[in-house]
Amino acid sequence: MKPVLTFFFDALKPDSLQHMPFLNSFPHQRRMRAELGHSVTCHPSMYSGVHPDKHLQWFVWKYDPVASPFAWARIFKYLGPLDNLGSRYFLHKYTRRLRPRNTAWFGVPLMLNQPLKYWPYFNVVEDRAWDEPGYLKKYPTAFDVLRQHDVSFEIVGMAKGAGDEFVQIGEHEFGEIHPWTYFFLGSVDHYSHRHGQDSPETIARLRELDRLVEAKFKAYDRRVSDFDFFVWSDHGHIRLERRVNIHAHFRRHGRNIHDFINLVEANYARFWFRDDDERVAVERILGDLDGGFVLTDEHFHRYHLQMPDNRYGDLVFYLDKPAMFSKTIWGFGRKQESMHGYLPDHPGSDGVFISNAPLIEGTHVELVDVLPTLLDSLGLPVPDYVDGRVLWRNHG
């Protein structure tokens, strides 16, 4: 079994490779087409080889009143004026103490700008980390598949709270060489959100990370004479030019957005309706909100987002680049300079795929191609249900 060395960069876009001479020296490069969503969408696609319409993960939060971690707190809907940031922090902290620990990357996040009366309607999609057994309920991940075949692997850089790449990866030394070694580099996304990926701060970081990858590659190369090597990212980044206050937009129409069950996140606003009148009202209000549109069945089909129920919304409003909502469940977005989660059709949404071996023809590959490509390198069978392709030109 030929060993495989891989590096994952969160949010690295193709244009940024000009600042990374080592990675850019590999001639076999493709643009990575993103999923329409954020990390909670992208990671299951790349680890399972199937699109969201199969793995069923699109947003961090879903409509699930029965299993909501806040189901016990329905009485708090009567707080009225006492429903403020302080009471929300308290309820969130208290609930996390009551429940078993959620080890997912996002855990159970605070819904900062969401009234407490709506918290019991929602549950988090993920309950464990990407590499833990059974992360996805319907499909095995790459980590699950390798465990099933008794193939060992090593993950470096994914441990939350253990420091950044220069701590976890920089201090790593190769001992036993496993069939798969996976380095996870997450700071490009953070720097891009904070400064923009074309900023001096992020460019300096990219150069440092390029040197780090080069050092690890050369250390591995000294130990292993023949191995497959590939690098990928899940999406790109797009500079923000404006912020949209959807709360103010509803007020201009004489309504409060919280008259309706909703979640506002980055560039998406999702709604659940209790009757037809609510749907009519929301559709009317959103009808003149510039810069976005309501996702239709055509979008759901095109981007593999067809779901079996309304867990992600009865209506999903998408705000296109280069804008984001200014007041969301995550905060106020004042420090955000760049964003992702836009249509995969936009070139700025693209990630990267780089390898040391020739790739199949075409300009783009997809996140669902990562799993079958990895399994093929390891000599393991690719399951029939997988949506992706093996990317090696000489495959088979």
Language model features by range: what are they?
Residues 14-61:
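Short, structured active-site-proximal loop/turn typified by the sulfatase FGly-forming signature C/S-X-P-X-R
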Residues 3-5, 178-182, 228, 314:
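Residue-level preference for the first positions of well-ordered beta-strands
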Residues 50-196, 205-208, 273, 280-281, ...:
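His/Asp/Glu-rich, glycine-adjacent segments
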Residues 32-33, 53-59, 154, 261, ...:
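Acidic/polar loop patches that form or flank catalytic/metal-binding clefts of enzymes
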Residues 14-17, 54-57, 67-68, 162-164, ...:
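Short catalytic/ligand-binding loop motif for oxyanion handling, primarily in non-cytosolic enzymes
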Residues 4-9, 14, 19, 208-248, ...:
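Metal-dependent active-site segment of extracytoplasmic phospho-/sulfohydrolases and closely related
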Residues 226, 235-274, 396:
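Acidic/histidine-rich catalytic neighborhood
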Residues 260-377:
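Active-site neighborhoods of enzymes that stabilize oxyanions during catalysis
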